[in-house]
Amino acid sequence: MGEIKGYISQVIGPVVDIHFDYGTEETVTLPRIHDAMEISRPNGKILIVEVQQHIGENTVRTVAMDTTDGLRRGMEAVSYGMPITMPTGDQVKGRLMNVTGDPIDGMAQLTKDGALPIHREPPKFEDLTTTQEVLYTGIKVIDLLEPYAKGGKIGLFGGAGVGKTVLIMELINNIAKKNNGFSVFAGVGERTREGNDLLREMIQSGVIRYGEEFKKSMEAGNWDLSKIDYDELAKSQATLVFGQMNEPPGARSSVALSGLTIAESFRDKASEGERKDILFFIDNIFRFTQAGSEVSALLGRMPSAVGYQPTLATEMGAMQERITSTKKGSITSVQAVYVPADDLTDPAPATTFTHLDATTVLSRKITELGIYPAVDPLESTSRILDPLIVGKEHYDTAQRVKQILQRNKELQDIISILGMEELSDEDRLTVNRARRVQRFLSQPFSVAEQFTGVPGVMVSIEDTIRGFKMIMDGETDDIPEQAFLNVGTIEDVLEKAKQLKEQAN
């Protein structure tokens, strides 16, 4: 389809109606649904709008990807017969983009050679892999109790300040180091400040590489783009795509698809015999639904339950079905989920749950104990915690850990009223071991090293299982509890206990 020109007939907030004149043969060619159209503003900047509806014979209704300030009736709009596309390839490594693929980091423009449309079909059945594989993260509590599946979808639940961003950062860091993996972060309705913090943390941890010279200038409080080393930038292991909170709903509802398109391009370009495992982060999936609800209302659709769009399940499914494993590689997604008014039956989180393979719940009560990551081991779940997938030893150890923690939770009321002395010897032993297990679930993170001064560690699943079995078998009953806090392997516990003993003497 070639170039089609129309003109603006109506502007209502972020909704723009575009009228097309009849041709010589009394017919009119309209752009297709989801095609992008360009409108040149008086200041020379281009506004992208996306076709959402055909109205009558010669009008389309579009949703703007940026503010519609300065538009007026009669302005020309051009369709090139293409949807919104995202740049791909090594050029996007370490870069920050908006929903239409334009850079927002102050660096050079990206070429659209090999660009991919953001609205795409999910992979065909014959291209999917049916093997169940665990994506080991090097984080003990996740690998043992709620293992992530390669190509799976993980929901990350947590309020403000419990460590969601730090956990996301550590996952990006560990996958980059352990599997030489690549990460894409989609900020859906993100606060601009959070996006800024995330970029700085990624530069600090070396996931995005601006070069040593820039890093030194950043630490001195400057932000000098002339100091960026572009050879280093090409070695970055993450790309960020943001549709910020202040942007129109059209941008916020599409930015997750823009990020996913980049993740798909890295997964699918794997060379023969090489598998690519991509991590895709969405923060926050609730805001994706919320933006879709706003677009639906602006287009005049009848609202469904609790005011959400009637197409909620369709929109969610269209995105989630693209996050999967193919023969070339996998996209594993970690999605932060905000639960409105803590109501899990709300249509937005309820629709998300149906797609998730694992849930990681962060708890404020655990942060109060000083245990980080503050993952709640009893609330978190995984579909692949199955002896046929993870192995019998792993499964049995995980179940024993959950049982001992559950028993400890049940005994807490008795302890708070009557004290430890009133417990039987068996229960007292259970509580003592549970407290050691609870503390051993903590771990120092590489991305938090600058705050804690403790070097981060990655723990293999074999070391994790061995450590927890030793605790539950009573081999560490004589070691003080504080030796288990914020360490990696069981050997680190023994070393820390030795140091504590020397300090006491």
From Swiss-Prot:
Q: Where in the cell is it found?
A: Cell inner membrane
Matching entries from PROSITE patterns are given as: ATPASE_ALPHA_BETA (PS00152)
Which positions are annotated as binding ATP? 158-165
The UniProt entry, under InterPro entries, shows: AAA+_ATPase, ATP-synt_VA_C, ATP_synth_F1_bsu, ATPase_a/bsu_AS, ATPase_alpha/beta_chains, ATPase_F1/V1/A1_a/bsu_N, ATPase_F1/V1/A1_a/bsu_N_sf, ATPase_F1/V1/A1_a/bsu_nucl-bd
Q: Which UniProt keywords apply?
A: ATP synthesis, ATP-binding, Cell inner membrane, Cell membrane, CF(1), Hydrogen ion transport, Ion transport, Membrane, Nucleotide-binding, Translocase, Transport
Q: Which GO terms describe its cellular component?
A: plasma membrane; proton-transporting ATP synthase complex
Q: Name one GO molecular function term.
A: proton-transporting ATP synthase activity, rotational mechanism
Q: List the SMART domains hit by this protein, alphabetically.
A: AAA
EC number per UniProt: 7.1.2.2
Q: Which Pfam families match?
A: ATP-synt_ab, ATP-synt_ab_N, ATP-synt_VA_C
Predominantly, its location class is membrane
Domain of life where this protein originates: Bacteria
Its recorded reaction(s) are: ATP + H2O + 4 H(+)(in) = ADP + phosphate + 5 H(+)(out)
Record membrane topology: Peripheral membrane protein
Which enzyme class, named as a word? translocase
Name the job this protein performs: Produces ATP from ADP in the presence of a proton gradient across the membrane. The catalytic sites are hosted primarily by the beta subunits.
Task: Describe its assembly.
Answer: F-type ATPases have 2 components, CF(1) - the catalytic core - and CF(0) - the membrane proton channel. CF(1) has five subunits: alpha(3), beta(3), gamma(1), delta(1), epsilon(1). CF(0) has three main subunits: a(1), b(2) and c(9-12). The alpha and beta chains form an alternating ring which encloses part of the gamma chain. CF(1) is attached to CF(0) by a central stalk formed by the gamma and epsilon chains, while a peripheral stalk is formed by the delta and b chains.
Sequence similarity: Belongs to the ATPase alpha/beta chains family.
Entry protein name: ATP synthase subunit beta
Species assigned in the record = Parabacteroides distasonis (strain ATCC 8503 / DSM 20701 / CIP 104284 / JCM 5825 / NCTC 11152)
UniProt lineage: Bacteria, Pseudomonadati, Bacteroidota, Bacteroidia, Bacteroidales
Q: Which gene encodes it?
A: atpD
